[in-house]
């Protein structure tokens, strides 16, 4: 059963897909919109994939990828906003959701790495 982080990341991915569809419908930017589609949906995909991790290292790896994809997505949001392809209000809203995901991922990664250290000492 998906947890709260998976649900939040899926809702964020849906927002990104809708943004991509809007940009495509408006015949606006294509390269940047594909980049944000890829990185923005990859966050949730890696979080979901971590649920089936075969080891703690595998789990940490998937969450680390999701974390990096979140920062890449942040970059694309900035670029789309600064080039006028999306309004500042939308950019701010997307970033608020993204920052929440980053915060949860940061905490989860710190905890998982600390647990791995503790386990390896036993």
Regions of interest found by a model, annotated:
Residues 1-49, 53-122:
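Short, C-terminally biased terminal segments at protein or domain edges
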